[in-house]
């Protein structure tokens, strides 16, 4: 797999303090008054914020062709905030901004550029605090308590727009066609971009751009926009505005992975009680849903989310494009979300080091390093550097994740649920769902205690019990039992400053209790776990066997029998299942000839699914990393919003993927 490295912008500041691109020899905004130019060209040119008052939906979606310093975004955010303050009961509640940038600014340059506009400081500071790493693809930033979403797509816009999945089609209410001047950057201003703009725009969706170049006007008209010239800003003679003139839906490109939003009332039952269900509930509540959580236990986080300490770091793969795309995005999203949550839980972003303790593990690490990821995400370390950073001798090098660390999943889950309850979540503990079935337009849930409930939609986020219903029993998931040992600190163990990963993992001590976590055992196919002394000893011995040069490892004492058992839900491809619950029988029936039909996707029926039934699970042992983004994807999908991953990666998360892959190859799905 060929790595794609994102290069930062190379810029300087001119005598007026305006940033200037060295690569394109052009200013990022007007020397005269960049803020007023943005208001005139992009806000006034799209009749904003006037359209906010009459907008019929709860979210207004803007797309932009060049993020640059973020001036357009910040100016629009300021206007949207003023609108929300003046009209808190308006239909429009949230702003969704999608932007593309090939050369993102460094954090320092971004801050310097923002110093130009003191009046934008309240919004600029929030953007700076969440400014993402330079990773290819989409980085979703959830701002202003969820009222503003920024999807920042890093890379070449003409390549990226073709990777957007079909949930982006006909979504954009307004386009900001910005970027360096066509004469300076002709590679961006292409017919392919104009066609993609039309595909993504809603019928009647508008556009505005600072240029009046003839080929731009003609290209937009050919793509389907009605385009007019108007007076340009300041000394510029003309600019262009327009609106999409046709209402022809674009053809689906991969209908076998089609994702459907929820329909009907925004009323959902979430079945679960762990971190995934808690974050999903919070995300749906912020989107105006009525959410009820049903948990079979008497308290939250009694399953795989109940550990005292869990490591947070991405799963990297040199061989699987979906893994390589999903987990870095998931990890960075998780860090931003955990840092922004107004929830108290034990954590330490102390870093994580994954060790190359033998030839096989070191080869794997070398392949990870070939991904050319930013050093702020992952970089190689030798044995000396491991000792300096981790505080203990291991005798081997590895790969360090400097922004990783550990957190307490049980406290996090409880805190998120408490926060969600403050926003209207209804929670019913001691409610085990024994059956699901459709009743008229709703789903009926039957509980083991004899109670019943009806909801318009249902999400199964119930861990290893995901496949425990007739509707989901064919999902290719499996349970993995495991045991984590809790060990007291010692002088040698107390020196550990980072999470160590080997053929197991060991956390630094939690200062709150002077205990470490070491684990975990792995029993595929085991759905009921009880304490095993053999697992306790195995957790200790794996550390000693992997790090024979580490004398401090001998201090690990598991004799107290202090441990926690749990069961994970996993898939063969190590990716979660996020999306509509697929209809297995209909998939086999409708896609019997998919291997032949796929050459003409416009003739293929959309993926058969069970209406308003969704799944969020199979998070395996990386739930702390994957749950936040997975929950965000599902909340967005159910609400009919654009999703924060490219189409190929979303397909790799689709619960029907393993069946469809076989059918596409002409093989039986079962």
UniProtKB/Swiss-Prot annotation:
Superkingdom per UniProt: Bacteria
Cofactor(s) needed for function: FAD
Protein purpose: Catalyzes the last two steps in the biosynthesis of 5-methylaminomethyl-2-thiouridine (mnm(5)s(2)U) at the wobble position (U34) in tRNA. Catalyzes the FAD-dependent demodification of cmnm(5)s(2)U34 to nm(5)s(2)U34, followed by the transfer of a methyl group from S-adenosyl-L-methionine to nm(5)s(2)U34, to form mnm(5)s(2)U34.
One GO location term (cellular component): cytoplasm
Record gene name: mnmC
ATP-binding is among the record's keywords: no
GO BP of this protein: methylation; tRNA wobble uridine modification
GO function term, MF aspect, one: flavin adenine dinucleotide binding
Pfam entry (one): DAO
Protein name: tRNA 5-methylaminomethyl-2-thiouridine biosynthesis bifunctional protein MnmC
Start and end residues of each stretch annotated as FAD-dependent cmnm(5)s(2)U34 oxidoreductase: 271-670
Keyword vocabulary terms for this entry: Cytoplasm, FAD, Flavoprotein, Methyltransferase, Multifunctional enzyme, Oxidoreductase, S-adenosyl-L-methionine, Transferase, tRNA processing
Matches recorded under InterPro entries: FAD-dep_OxRdtase, FAD/NAD-bd_sf, MnmC-like_methylTransf, SAM-dependent_MTases_sf, tRNA_MAMT_biosynth_bifunc_MnmC, tRNA_MNMC2, tRNA_S-uridine_synth_MnmC_C
Similarity comment: family membership: In the N-terminal section; belongs to the methyltransferase superfamily. tRNA (mnm(5)s(2)U34)-methyltransferase family. In the C-terminal section; belongs to the DAO family.
Cellular localization per UniProt: Cytoplasm
Spans annotated as tRNA (mnm(5)s(2)U34)-methyltransferase: 1-245
EC number(s) recorded for this UniProt protein: 2.1.1.61, 1.5.-.-
Gene3D superfamilies tied to this protein: D-Amino Acid Oxidase, subunit A, domain 2 (3.30.9.10), FAD/NAD(P)-binding domain (3.50.50.60), Vaccinia Virus protein VP39 (3.40.50.150)
């Amino acid at each position: 797999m060929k790595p794609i490295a994102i290069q930062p912008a190379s810029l300087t500041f001119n005598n007026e303090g305006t940033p200037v691109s060295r690569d394109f020899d052009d200013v990022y905004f007007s020397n005269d008054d960049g803020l007023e130019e943005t208001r005139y060209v992009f806000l006034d040119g799209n009749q904003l914020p006037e359209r906010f008052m009459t907008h019929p939906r709860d979210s207004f979606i803007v797309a932009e062709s060049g993020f640059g310093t973020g001036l357009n975004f910040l100016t629009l955010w300021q206007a949207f905030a003023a609108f929300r303050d003046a009209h808190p009961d308006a239909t429009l509640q949230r702003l969704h901004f999608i932007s593309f940038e090939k050369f993102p600014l460094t954090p320092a340059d971004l801050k310097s550029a923002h110093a130009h506009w003191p009046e934008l400081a309240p919004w600029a500071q929030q953007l700076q605090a969440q400014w993402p790493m330079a990773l290819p693809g989409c980085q979703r930033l959830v701002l202003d308590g969820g009222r503003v979403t920024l999807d920042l797509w890093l890379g070449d816009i003409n390549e990226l727009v073709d990777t957007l999945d079909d949930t982006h089609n006909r979504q954009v209410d307004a386009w900001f066609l910005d970027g360096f001047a066509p004469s300076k950057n002709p590679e961006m201003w292409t017919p392919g971009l104009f066609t993609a703009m039309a595909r993504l725009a809603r019928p009647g969706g508008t556009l505005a751009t600072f240029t009046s170049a003839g080929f731009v006007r003609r290209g937009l008209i050919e793509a389907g926009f009605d385009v007019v010239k108007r007076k340009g800003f300041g000394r510029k003679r003309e600019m262009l505005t327009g609106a999409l003139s046709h209402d022809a839906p674009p053809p689906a490109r991969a209908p076998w992975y089609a994702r459907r939003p929820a329909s009907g009332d925004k009323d959902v039952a979430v079945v679960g009680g762990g971190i995934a269900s808690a974050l999903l509930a919070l995300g749906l509540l912020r989107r105006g849903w009525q959410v009820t959580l049903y948990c079979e236990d008497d308290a939250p986080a009694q399953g795989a989310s109940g550990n005292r300490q869990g490591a947070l770091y991405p799963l990297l793969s040199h061989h699987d494009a979906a893994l390589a795309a999903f987990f870095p995005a998931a990890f960075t999203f998780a860090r931003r979300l955990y840092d922004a949550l107004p929830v108290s839980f034990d954590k330490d972003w102390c870093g994580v080091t994954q060790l190359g303790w033998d030839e096989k593990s070191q080869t794997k690490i070398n392949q990870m390093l070939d991904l050319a990821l930013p050093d702020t995400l992952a970089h190689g370390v030798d044995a000396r550097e491991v000792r300096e950073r981790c505080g203990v001798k291991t005798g081997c090098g590895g790969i360090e994740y400097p922004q990783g660390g550990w957190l307490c999943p049980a406290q996090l889950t409880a805190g998120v649920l408490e926060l969600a309850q403050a926003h209207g979540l209804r929670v019913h503990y001691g409610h085990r769902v024994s059956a699901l079935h459709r009743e008229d337009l709703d789903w009926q849930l039957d509980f083991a205690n004899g109670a019943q409930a009806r909801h318009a939609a249902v999400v199964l986020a119930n861990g290893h019990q995901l496949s425990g219903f007739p509707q989901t029993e064919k999902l290719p998931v499996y349970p993995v039992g495991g045991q984590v040992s809790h060990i007291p600190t010692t002088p040698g163990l107390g020196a550990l400053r980072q999470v160590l990963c080997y053929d197991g993992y060991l956390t630094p001590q939690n200062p709150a209790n002077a205990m470490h976590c070491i684990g975990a055992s792995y029993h595929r196919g085991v759905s009921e776990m009880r304490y095993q002394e053999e697992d306790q000893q195995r957790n200790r011995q794996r550390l000693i066997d992997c790090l024979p040069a580490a004398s401090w490892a001998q201090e690990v004492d598991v004799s107290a029998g202090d441990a926690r058992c749990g069961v994970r839900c996993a898939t063969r491809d190590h990716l979660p299942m996020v999306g509509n619950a697929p209809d297995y029988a209909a998939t086999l029936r409708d896609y019997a000839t998919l291997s032949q039909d796929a050459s003409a996707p416009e003739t293929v029926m959309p993926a058969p699914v069970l209406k308003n039934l969704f799944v969020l699970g199979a998070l395996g042992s990386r739930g702390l990393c994957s749950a936040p983004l997975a929950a965000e994807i599902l909340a967005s999908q159910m609400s009919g919003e654009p999703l924060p991953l490219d189409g190929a990666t979303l397909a790799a998360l689709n619960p029907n993927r393993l069946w469809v892959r076989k059918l596409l190859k002409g093989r039986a799905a079962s």
